[in-house]
Amino acid sequence: MFYHGGTFISLLENPMRRLASLLTLSLFPLLGGCSSTPAAKPVVVPQPKSAFINQTPSRSPVYSQGVSKGDFANRTNVDRFVQKMVEKHGFDSAQLHQVLAQAERYDWIIRLMDAQAPTTAKPTGPTGAWNRYRAKFITPDNVQNGVNFWREYASELNRAEQIYGVPPEIIVGIIGVETRWGRVMGKTRILDALATLAFDYPRRAEFFTSELEAFLVMTRDEGMDPTEPKGSYAGAMGYGQFMPSSFQRYAVDFDGNGHTNLWDPVDAIGSVANYFKAHGWEKGQPVAVRGQGQLPGYEHGFQTRYPVASLRRAGLTPTSSLGNHSEASLLRLDVGTGYQYWYGLPNFYAITRYNHSTHYAMAVWQLGLAVKAAR
C-alpha cells in the first residue's frame, strides 16, 4: 500500500512500503495520499498534541505565474501527462505546466530506487537476518515513544477499533515502523519525488505517473499547494506513509473537520484502520502463532497456504490457538542459531498488504504488542 523511501522507511525490506503502494494525489499539491474530497477551501488543521509532529501544508493553493523553465519544462512526456490531466480531471493546462515546471529532478532518488530493487540472492544458512531487522524497531526508546503516542491518542485509537475492528496495537505498530509516530515522515518534496520517478524512471514510470496524477488531484481537492508537501523519496506521505493512490482509496477525515490530512495523527489513525478493514482484517482473530517443530523442506512465506492438519502431520504444532482457521501460511524467521516457524493467519496477511514483507509484518505486530505490554 505504501512506498517507503525516507530515512526510517528505507530500513524496510520489499519496496512497497515501498511499493505496494503508498500515498495520494490531487490537482496541484504533490504530497501525501488522500482520497478525493469536496471542493477546496481554507482548512484549519488542529495542532498535534504534545511533541508529536504535524506537518501541515498550507491549505490555499498558490501557483507561480509564468514559469517556463525547469527540469520538467518543455518535455514531451510531461505535455502528454498534462493533456491527460486536462481531459480526465479538468485541470488548466497552462497552470499545471507552471506547477510541473517548478518540480526538480534528483538523480539520488533514482539511485535509491535502484538500490531497493529486489534481489534473488538467498542465504546458504541462518545468519540472524530476523534478529537484525527486529532490532531496528523494537528498542526500549522506541517502545516508550509508542507508549507515549498511545496514551496521547487513546480515545482516537479506541474509536478506530470500534468503527473498523482493528486493535490499537496494530495501528500503533504500523505508525511506529513507518515514521516512528511522526518523527521521521520524510523531507523530500512529494512533487519532486513523483515527477522524477514518473518522467525519468522508465522501469516504474507507469506506477509513479499514476501516483503523480493522484497526488495532484489530492492537493487540488484538499486546497493544498502542490509544491509544499514533503514525504519519502518515493512519494509516501504522512504518519502512515500512504502513497497518493492509497489516500484516494482509504484515507478518512477521522477528526471530522472537513479535510483529510495524513500529516495529522488523528486522520492517520482512522486511515490506517480503514486500510486494514478494507484488506480483510478479522476482528478478534489472532495474527500469527509460533510453531513447535522444524519443516526445512517446506516452501515458506506469507503467500504460502497449508492445511493446518498437514503441517501437524509433518511435525509442526501450534503453541497457542489458531482461532477458527484450518489453513495458514508457513512463516520462517532466521534467528541466527536456526529458524523459527510460525503459522501466518489472515490478519498477518492483511499487514503484508501494507508492505509485502514477512519481516515487515512481523515487526509491526511485535512492536505493537511490545508497546501494549509496556503501557
Give the role of each language-model region.
Residues L30-G33:
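C-terminal motif of bacterial Sec signal peptides marking the signal peptidase cleavage site
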